[in-house]
């Protein structure tokens, strides 16, 4: 069909989320080393245009909502050449401790998340 397989978008979301974390000085593995886990509990993608094989894309990642033990990442997949939005999506995550039960987001992580400017990722 000449375009990317639909499930690849969720892989791109994961890669973009990891890059977002690394840009702020922590890796997901750092959370696991501390006994925390941040599983995806909900995911959505709305396809607005196709991504063709070998097309260069960018994924804009923002945190749009923070709750006591959960946070939402939003993603916008754009064609790097034209800026056209191809896909918009989000993932909800719940912070869990080693007992695999939801726990409050630690103060230092919450502070970092609250410093992040919330913005509309669909605005170029």
Question: Which role does the model predict for each range below?
Answer:
Residues 1-40, 97-124:
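Hot-dog-fold acyl-thioester-processing enzymes
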Residues 20-71, 88:
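Hydrophobic beta-strand-centered segment that forms part of the acyl-chain substrate-binding groove
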Residues 3-4, 40-41, 59, 77, ...:
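Hydrophobic aliphatic residue packing
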Residues 51-56, 64-124:
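HotDog/MaoC-like acyl-thioester-processing domains
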């Amino acid at each position: 069909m000449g375009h990317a397989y639909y499930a690849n978008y969720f892989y791109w979301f994961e890669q973009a989320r990891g890059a977002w974390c690394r840009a702020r000085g922590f890796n997901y593995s750092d959370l696991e080393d501390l006994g925390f886990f941040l599983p995806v509990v909900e995911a959505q993608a709305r396809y607005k245009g196709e991504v063709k094989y070998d097309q260069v894309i960018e994924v804009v990642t923002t945190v749009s909502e923070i709750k006591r033990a959960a946070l939402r990442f939003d993603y916008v997949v754009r064609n790097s050449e034209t800026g056209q939005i191809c896909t918009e999506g989000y993932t909800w995550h719940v912070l869990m401790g080693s007992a695999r039960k939801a726990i409050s987001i630690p103060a230092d992580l919450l502070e970092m998340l609250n410093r992040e400017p919330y913005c509309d990722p669909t605005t170029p």
